[in-house]
Every structure is written in structure tokens, then in C-alpha cells.
């Protein structure tokens, strides 16, 4: 659900064609998101949504209709929920991580669908229904245990590798800037970083390098401005937090003794909807 063709192109650039099939929908001037999505809700497995399109009315309509999907929200990391609790967030300057976070969003959604003790409302039933469909298509364990080696950092072309590292650098900067002042926003940035690090097989040494380089930048800037910089040592907690989350993801990546279906598709369908006229569709 994106407001411009340029943003659609950018998202498509970072959704590998051998793994994702984009489903482009047109949202009419007098139509809401729920009205557009409902007739084709079985055609896609995840959505990429621009944050400014998810106002309170649109969100309420989607929830009432039970239209809940694994979601990546494109926009500012603000620390609040725009769509549902399992959503992930990426700013526009970090879309090089989009494919990895779509994988992570689907994994989170599958885990939610298997959670116990949830109230049986329309939205919860929709989550369970989509989770079952995803399990049939992807295998019971989903994409969480099926990292694609062709998308590992070491397998990327040099330009892609550079762009991904720069994107991760910006995400980690967002994490540090909000770590003590806005824990909710910091957590969203942390999730994006950890998801990409896991699915791209980012070496731990690279994570430490990103942290050290940023802290060094801040140290030099504070020194030039004549400010104290001793407090920067406290940001080691952010690095420990990232490492703890990565350890948990790798722990979960060890499959339990659960039989896999005989057939499971690795090709995902992602809705990249564009609320524009049909003439402007790609």
C-alpha cells in the first residue's frame, strides 16, 4: 500500500523476483483499503504499507474486516502500532532490508497464529486462517527456518552488499539515538536490524564493527563540540541487547522434531498496493 510509483519501484527492487511475486492493486478515490483488499485477500501472503495511509479509520476498517496480514510498515520509526502488534517497521532510506523483513514478518505472524489463549474474535480467526494457509504453502516451520543462502551477505553482488551495510548502519544509528529516550522506537529499530542480520547471515564481527564505528563518530563529534563523552560507554547495553536478540533468533532457528509437509512453495506473494488510478499502475 504505497502512495507513489517511485516507492513501488524501490520496494520491488528489494524484493527478489525469484522469491517474491508482487500483487499490485489499485485503490480508487472513493474506496478504502479494506474494500480494495477484501476481494483478493487470498492472493497474497504479506503486505508492504506506507505509514501515512494507515490512519485510524483505515486501521479500524481493516481490523473489523479481519484483514490482517504479515506487514512491513514503510515510514518513520515512531514506536507505536500502526496496523497490528506483529508489524515491522522500515524507514524509506532502509528499504534495502525489505526482503529480509518480509520474511521476518511472516515468521512473526506464524508464531502468533500458533499462540494459545487468544480471544476468538474476527481478527484472531483471520490470523489463524492465514497462518494455516502459510504453513501449507511454506511448510509448518515457515520461512524462519528456511533462510535463503543466495541472499546471505557474502552471496550478494558488491553494490548490493554495500547498500545493505549502509542501510543497516542507518538502522543501528536510529537504535542508538532512541535507545534511552524512546524505548518503543528503539525496539522497532532493533527488530529491523536483528531481522536483517539474521536472514542475511551478517557476521557478528560486522555488527560489532557497525556499533564501534558509530560510537567513534559520536565520540569525535562530542569532543569537537567540547562536551563530555563518558556516557557513550552506556551504549554498550544496546550492543548487548542486539546480541541477545540475535542469540534468541538463532536458538529458535534450530527446528524441533516436527514433520514437514511433502510439498511447500518457497515463492511468496507480497501485496505492493498503490492507491492511484489504474493508468498509473506499473
Where on the chain are the PLM-derived regions?
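Non-catalytic regulatory/interaction regions at protein termini and inter-domain linkers
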Residues: 1-282
Amino acid at each position: 500500500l504505497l502512495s507513489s510509483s517511485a516507492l513501488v519501484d524501490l520496494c520491488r527492487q528489494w524484493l527478489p523476483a525469484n522469491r517474491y511475486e508482487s500483487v499490485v492493486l489499485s485503490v480508487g478515490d472513493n474506496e478504502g483499503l479494506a474494500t480494495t483488499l477484501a476481494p483478493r485477500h487470498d492472493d497474497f501472503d504479506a503486505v508492504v504499507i506506507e505509514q501515512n495511509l494507515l490512519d485510524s479509520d483505515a486501521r479500524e476498517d481493516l481490523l473489523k474486516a479481519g484483514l490482517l496480514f504479515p506487514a512491513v510498515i514503510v515510514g518513520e520509526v515512531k514506536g507505536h502500532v500502526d496496523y497490528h502488534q506483529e508489524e515491522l517497521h522500515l524507514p524509506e532510506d532502509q528499504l534495502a532490508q525489505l526482503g529480509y523483513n518480509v520474511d521476518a514478518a511472516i515468521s512473526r505472524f506464524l508464531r502468533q497464529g500458533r499462540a494459545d489463549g487468544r480471544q476468538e474474535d474476527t481478527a484472531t480467526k483471520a490470523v489463524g486462517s492465514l497462518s494455516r494457509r502459510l504453513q501449507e504453502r511454506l511448510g509448518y516451520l515457515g520461512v524462519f527456518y528456511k533462510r535463503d543462502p543466495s541472499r546471505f551477505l557474502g552471496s550478494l553482488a558488491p553494490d548490493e552488499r554495500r547498500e545493505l551495510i549502509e542501510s543497516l548502519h542507518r538502522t543501528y544509528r536510529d537504535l542508538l539515538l532512541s535507545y534511552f529516550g524512546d524505548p518503543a522506537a528503539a525496539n522497532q529499530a532493533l527488530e529491523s536490524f536483528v531481522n536483517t542480520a539474521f536472514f542475511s547471515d551478517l557476521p557478528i564481527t560486522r555488527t560489532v564493527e557497525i556499533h564501534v564505528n558509530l560510537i567513534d563518530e559520536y565520540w569525535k563529534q562530542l569532543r569537537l563540540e567540547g562536551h563530555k563523552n563518558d556516557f557513550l560507554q552506556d551504549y554498550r547495553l544496546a550492543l548487548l541487547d542486539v546480541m541477545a536478540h540475535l542469540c534468541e533468533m538463532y536458538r529458535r532457528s534450530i527446528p524441533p522434531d516436527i514433520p514437514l509437509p511433502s510439498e511447500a512453495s518457497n515463492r511468496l506473494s507480497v501485496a505492493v498496493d498503490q492507491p492511484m488510478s489504474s493508468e498509473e499502475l506499473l
